[in-house]
Amino acid sequence: ILNDSGGRSIHFEPLFPGEISYSRSESLWLARGGVAAQHSSQPLSALWQVLPEDVRLSPHVYLATNSLQGPWWILSWPEPPAYRVLTVVVDGFGRSLTFHRAAEGDVAGAVTGVTDGAGRRFHMALSTQAQRAEASRKQRASSLSSPASPRSVSSSQVFPDTLPAGTEYGADNGIRLEAVWLTHDPAYPDEQPTAPLARYTYTAGGELRAVYDRSGTQVRGFTYDAEHAGRMVAHHYAGRPESRYRYDDTGRVTEQVNPEGLDYRFEYGESRVIITDSLNRREVLYTEGEGGLKRVVKKEHADGSITRSEYDEAGRLKAQTDAAGRRTEYRLHMASGKLTSVVLPDGRTVRYGYNNQLQLTSVTYPDGLRSSRKYDR
């Protein structure tokens, strides 16, 4: 089972050493180390060779990628548990990002350092909920002892020492990223930064409140529902007005308010969503499928016109019919999912060609004209 940062849990059959499996619905390959080279018929054979030899030969290492050009996500272990974690990312040119994890302490197992392919080292400053609570108490005490000091929102919040162990989003250990520091740059070995590249602050509930850049300027801000942990009700970018959101009892967005733009209202029915903007223009989206395979199959536009879309069993677009009833077909390669041809409403066809790395090499138009492209690798 491969768990990614998007919340997906993708199931694969157990792999033998050197074996590669492909998920058509998720467009993702999962591979297991154990061989020096893949057979030339394997689409990932060239990308396999950019990996370090020890990674290719180790049957204990698993790798994932969503493109024949990379990158590889290397899943290994600091010491052998029943699961593997991301340890290295290697791109199609062999350049790497290596992740270093804390071996002990309150943040054991969390990423605390990154080394890139140029030799630069970055430190990830982490904090626990207890540490943030202690810092908040000290800030609050300092504020109370100095009446002239301005009272911030954060100083008025009561930070609990722990967070609920389980949330509707999953387990939460309370560890958060506080700042990212550049600690070593081979090009400037004698220079030490005096400020982090980025800094983050959090609410008493562990939600991200603000993001600051290296100059100390706040570039993002977030507000949350006090009754529903993790539910964002507003956000803004530096120099821009705040966008706000309202929700129904099931946690679905019912309204988006944009002070300097259009506002939107959302109504939900069985397999449909009605979207109305502040100019009273109305669109309706009709959906089919469940979970990650849910797709919009029909769209009623504000002018009354209707477009329809058709998908294959993997959720990939295979045809669209416009408001005039003209149908365009999209034909895909069975294994890779790449677009091989487009059949226009009048029956004419545009064809697409690819190389062994699935990079687009040619487009042939209905009138016979052909464009081509070449790659240096």
Show where each model-derived region lies.
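Extended charged/polar low-complexity repeat regions
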Residues: 1-377
